[in-house]
């Protein structure tokens, strides 16, 4: 196992540590404002005091456990701490109290485009504060400077079978980055528990910086014949622009796609802590596994059909519908196709949510983005998604087997990638994996800063449940 072990380090010692990737741009951003680590350092004491106040109420109850919670995947249980976001069934997601629309208005934008930067969302998730544009320019540059991946990881990706699932490649590459983990090395040497957060922070920033590079290399190898990426990392550009450029969508002519990517990455970054990718990252991290191993676990959870594959399933279903109904379809044609899907025992993909009971604000944000751009609004596939969102809720209500008949974010994300020429649906989850690093990695830093313990819930067998509840 190539984990934290000294023997593993020796085994990999002969490999060159870093590729010497070329970077363009020379101008830095001088600022008297604190950088991200300094801002976080200032926030930690107050949060530790808050934890002490909460612990003073340790014997009080914040909920009850029903049999349906235990049998139903722990759904609805308040069982873990998650600082960055809170999901309300009726209001949707809030990031430190801010709605998506608030974030779109308040968070810094890129040098081009109008959408919030996902690295600004990370700053908000981690610190609870809205950064200045100058602070984010400095942070974007730091991410660009750390974007290169070790040479042995690049070679590993190059040697994978081209048809190996992108998420398998992604998880393995992220796990292998643990070879350079500052936290793992500091822990081996002995580290005060109060200081765990700092090398964890360093690892999280390093990983966040490298996620687009890994994902772009997977795309290049799997779908574009391998070889060098289409663009080098530009130190003057933001995280999303560089990801877009490495996917072959750099330059002024691709500004709309770059802005879509900013919005997509920011929207998908965090959605409370109970979803599989976030919880898996937290769970593995609670054992003091470093951020690379922890987020690799999150990526493997994200690869599951019930979690991160929904966007590709929606697109496939929409394209099948488009082929099955007339070119000049009516609302009745769409209605009939929806019923045929349900009557065949299948679900309508892209509708419903484990928590939400209203339309997903992330779906609305992406649809608003698309509707404001004529080239997308006129796309027949997008128009069909739009028509479905108007008709499907009533059909699902009549069907009566869903608590939330409204569209979720997956209804719109895949079709937008498809519009911009990304037709490789298996890859959509890898893009999700770049985004989802924002929330779980921010929380992982707080897990270490607050000294949260290893996760160890109590399990019970079915006989035990029955004995406990019979006669109640």
From Swiss-Prot:
Keyword flag Transcription: no
Gene: mcsA
GO cellular component: mitochondrial matrix
Disulfide bond entries: none
The protein's assembly and partners: Homodimer.
Pfam families: Citrate_synt (PF00285)
Protein name: 2-methylcitrate synthase, mitochondrial
Family annotation (PROSITE patterns): CITRATE_SYNTHASE
Keywords annotated in UniProt: Acyltransferase, Mitochondrion, Transferase, Transit peptide
